[in-house]
């Protein structure tokens, strides 16, 4: 299969189950909503070494937020619900409560699983907290130096999916990077998914385990490293490719990830010099979800 003259390899992305909480952060301005969201989703690229995977899902206009202010939806992902609640308390408590003019609301109010994060955060007020209603939602008011921090009582979570992905092969580093940026920018407009790596782009895609250093649980995926393609017998790098970037996608459900992969790939192949699109899988060892590239189109 080719799209815009770019080969789409007949392969699939392998993904795995994960628990996802969705939080709506609002602030007086879009700038401060984004600052708080960026801080709250830091150090969360991969569960390989991070305590969570997290990222910004999308912006929310004042017309769709409970308090009528600019907002940002974020997703926070862990393997277990217990760890997810800890991450919510730590990230909201340290990165949102401390940020100017912010408030937090439940991004999954209909979810069966609910954490009483706002209820627990109210204890920061040391007895001076109070309750109010905003757009029919129970919210706690925590007095702080600038005024009041507002936190909805509960934050919802569901069983989602992590590890949807695709690889972009370019004739140069700048070609591949430009295509990856185009893909991430397009995915950022969609609902239900995040791209948790720096700027949404993975420069150092890994394989599970190691060939030599067995004490590591993930190491460089040498088959996709252009600088050593002449040294690797089973290299996946064509002669005319000199850089590869991976886009990793987590999402609330399969359809959201499929939509993000499709949109991202369509954006990437518009960049001249992109030679091929592929995806990462581990023969079923990593997860139960398979997103076949050809079936996306």
Curated annotation (Swiss-Prot):
Chain coiled-coil ranges: none
User: Could you state a single Gene Ontology molecular function term?
Assistant: formylmethanofuran-tetrahydromethanopterin N-formyltransferase activity
Record's subcellular location: Cytoplasm
Membrane-spanning residues: none
Enzyme's top EC category: transferase
Q: Name one GO biological process term.
A: methanogenesis, from carbon dioxide
Pfam families recorded:
FTR, FTR_C
Q: What is its EC number?
A: 2.3.1.101
GO CC aspect terms? cytoplasm
Keyword set, alphabetical order = Acyltransferase, Cytoplasm, Methanogenesis, One-carbon metabolism, Transferase
> Which reaction does this enzyme catalyse, per its entry?
N-formylmethanofuran + 5,6,7,8-tetrahydromethanopterin + H(+) = N(5)-formyl-5,6,7,8-tetrahydromethanopterin + methanofuran
Query: Which InterPro entries does its entry note?
Result: ForMFR_H4MPT_ForTrfase, ForMFR_H4MPT_ForTrfase_C, ForMFR_H4MPT_ForTrfase_fd-like, ForMFR_H4MPT_ForTrfase_N
Family per record: Belongs to the FTR family.
Function, as annotated, reads: Catalyzes the reversible transfer of a formyl group from formylmethanofuran (formyl-MFR) to tetrahydromethanopterin (H(4)MPT) to produce 5-formyl tetrahydromethanopterin (5-formyl-H(4)MPT) and methanofuran (MFR).
- Tell me the NCBIfam families matching this sequence: one_C_fhcD, PRK02114.1
Q: How does it assemble?
A: Homotetramer.
| Protein name, per record | Formylmethanofuran--tetrahydromethanopterin formyltransferase
Lineage of origin: Archaea, Methanobacteriati, Methanobacteriota, Stenosarchaea group, Methanomicrobia
């Amino acid at each position: 299969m080719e799209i815009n003259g770019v080969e789409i390899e007949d392969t699939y992305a392998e993904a795995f189950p994960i628990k996802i909480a969705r939080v709506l952060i609002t602030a007086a301005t879009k700038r401060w909503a984004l600052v708080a969201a960026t801080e709250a989703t830091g150090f969360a690229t991969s569960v390989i070494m991070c305590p969570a995977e997290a990222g910004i899902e999308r912006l929310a206009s004042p017309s769709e937020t409970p308090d009528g202010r600019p907002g940002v939806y974020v997703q926070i992902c862990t393997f277990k619900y217990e760890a997810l609640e800890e991450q919510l308390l730590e990230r909201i408590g340290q990165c949102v409560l401390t940020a100017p003019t912010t408030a937090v609301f439940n991004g999954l109010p209909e979810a069966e699983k609910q954490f009483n994060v706002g209820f627990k955060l109210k204890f920061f007020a040391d007895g001076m907290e109070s309750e109010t209603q905003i757009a029919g939602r129970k919210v706690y008011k925590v007095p702080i130096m600038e005024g009041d921090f507002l936190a909805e009582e509960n934050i919802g979570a569901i069983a989602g999916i992590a590890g949807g992905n695709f690889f972009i092969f370019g004739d140069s580093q700048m070609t591949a990077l430009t295509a990856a940026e185009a893909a991430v920018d397009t995915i950022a407009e969609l609902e239900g998914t995040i791209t948790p790596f720096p700027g949404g782009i993975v420069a150092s895609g890994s394989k599970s385990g190691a060939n030599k250093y067995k004490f590591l649980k993930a190491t460089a995926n040498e088959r996709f490293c252009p600088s050593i393609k002449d040294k690797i017998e089973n290299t996946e790098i064509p002669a005319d490719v000199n850089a590869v970037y991976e886009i990793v996608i987590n999402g609330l459900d399969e359809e959201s990830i499929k939509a993000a992969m499709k949109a991202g790939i369509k954006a990437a192949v518009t960049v001249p010099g992109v030679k091929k699109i592929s995806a990462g899988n581990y023969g079923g060892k990593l997860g139960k979800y398979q997103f076949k590239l050809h079936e996306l189109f």
